[in-house]
C-alpha cells in the first residue's frame, strides 16, 4: 500500500492508515483492520506529515524536493520487499510510482512494475471531490475488485 504521506492520526498513533481515510480504504477492500495490516506493508511518497493544506481542507501536498528526499526509501523498500502487488493510493502516489497522471485513466486498471502487479486507487480522503462523481465511484469499486482478486491469487 503506497500513499502520499502520513496524516495527523498516523503520526499520533504511529501506524499508517489509522484515520478516516484508512477506515474508508479498508471498507473498499472489505478487510478488517487486522486483515489489512497482515496483508499490506504500508509505505508512502514521503515519511513525514506535510502539514495542513493552505486552504485548510486536507493535507498539504509534499513539495517535489520533499518527495525526492524520500525517494531513496521507496526504492529501497521495493528492492528489499519485492512485493507481488502494489496499490498506489492517490494521484501523487500513482505519479511517483508509475509516472502516470489522471485518476480516471488509471483507477481500475492493472499495470506491471517489474515482477509486481500495480492497481491504483484514488485517495479515500473526504477532501477529494473526485469520488463525488458516480462514474468515479464505480472505477473505485472496480479497482477494489481487481485488488481482492489479486490478493486471492498471490
Task: List each language-model region with its residue ranges.
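A polyanion-binding, active-site-adjacent surface
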Residues: 1-154
Amino acid at each position: 500500500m503506497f500513499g502520499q504521506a502520513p496524516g495527523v492520526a498516523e503520526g499520533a498513533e504511529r501506524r499508517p492508515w489509522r484515520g478516516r481515510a484508512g477506515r474508508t480504504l479498508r471498507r473498499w477492500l472489505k478487510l478488517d483492520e487486522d486483515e489489512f495490516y497482515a496483508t499490506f506493508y504500508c509505505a508512502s511518497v514521503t515519511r513525514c506529515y506535510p502539514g495542513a493544506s493552505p486552504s485548510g481542507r486536507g493535507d498539504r501536498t509534499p513539495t517535489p524536493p520533499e518527495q525526492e528526499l524520500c525517494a531513496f526509501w521507496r526504492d529501497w523498500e521495493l528492492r528489499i520487499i519485492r512485493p507481488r502487488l502494489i496499490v498506489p493510493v492517490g494521484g501523487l502516489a500513482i505519479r511517483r510510482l508509475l509516472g502516470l497522471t489522471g485518476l480516471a485513466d488509471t483507477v481500475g486498471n492493472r499495470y506491471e512494475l517489474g515482477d509486481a502487479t500495480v492497481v491504483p486507487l484514488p485517495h479515500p480522503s473526504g477532501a477529494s471531490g473526485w469520488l463525488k462523481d458516480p462514474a468515479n465511484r464505480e472505477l473505485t469499486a472496480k479497482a477494489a475488485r481487481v485488488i481482492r482478486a489479486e490478493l486471492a491469487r498471490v
